[in-house]
Amino acid sequence: MTITTATQALALSCVPMGPGDVYRIVSDSEDPFLVIEGRVSFDETLLPQYSDANPRATEKPTEIPAQVTGLLLGERMFDQPVEGEITLEAHCLGPWCGSLVSGARYLFFARQTEDRVVAVVEPCGGFFFSAEDGSAGDTVLQCHLGGICPSQLPASLEGAVTPLAED
């Protein structure tokens, strides 16, 4: 006699959003957003890590100070030099946590508040895109200048949550 048991495989299913999708979302947001293409440096050891021993430790976002050097999206192009501190707000969803590589170049969308700039780091990517090949910046410029704004979203978003969803 053979006894088999089924275990549920855990997997995070992310909606494949591209820079054009996020550009449209933040453009429609009431919150002021900055679009930055540049190098982000921070202490990677501060990124949240899920632990079975303490699963509740990653329920709240982790704020991480970071330095950014790059260009801010202006009226027609990425032409405004930016250098300074931002706050990375790293989120986890169950055992999956957002992560970045310190020193890498990203195109990212950051919320401007009264006293700081906050960039959300999610398990599914969300607001950060690699800027190493320049394609993310090209896509955002195309959207920004009123051209075709390509989407990577599936035809149906039934049950999906956007990066700006309220908790």
Language-model features: locations:
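Transition segments tied to proteolytic processing and entry into folded domains
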Residues: 8-167
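Bacterial N-terminal signal peptides
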Residues: 1-5
